[in-house]
Amino acid sequence: MPFVELETNLPSQNVPQDLAEKLCSATATILGKPRERVNVTVRTGVSMVVGGSSAPCTQLFISSIGVVGTAEQNKEHSAKFFNFLTEQLGLAQDRILLRFVPIEPWQIGKNGTIMTFL
């Protein structure tokens, strides 16, 4: 069950209106998870500084069970997420940061229980 949170200082009018839907589909493909299990949040107009500059930028936080736990996995995922974000947001790669966080099934609650028991 991936959780993906995108924050950008781009104003909403400079971000594709359907970015959350596109990011959901891209995440499902990149991580090899069913689309219906992907959770996406997009926040625009956030006050941000990356590399000492408030020029247009974005951060993408990716957490998931089992697919973001190794350097090899994340190197592959990173290239694909960078391609997606540069295409969708028109930002240079040096204005994009990704953070991968592996999580365990017992750390996610759903339907009155935790994923361990679903």
Curated annotation (Swiss-Prot):
This is D-dopachrome decarboxylase-A. Disulfide bonds: none annotated. Keywords: Acetylation, Cytoplasm, Lyase, Melanin biosynthesis. It is found in: Cytoplasm. SUPFAM superfamilies: Tautomerase/MIF. The gene is ddt-a. InterPro entries: Macrophage_inhib_fac (IPR001398), Tautomerase/MIF_sf (IPR014347). Tautomerization of D-dopachrome with decarboxylation to give 5,6-dihydroxyindole (DHI). Pfam families: MIF. It catalyses: D-dopachrome + H(+) = 5,6-dihydroxyindole + CO2.
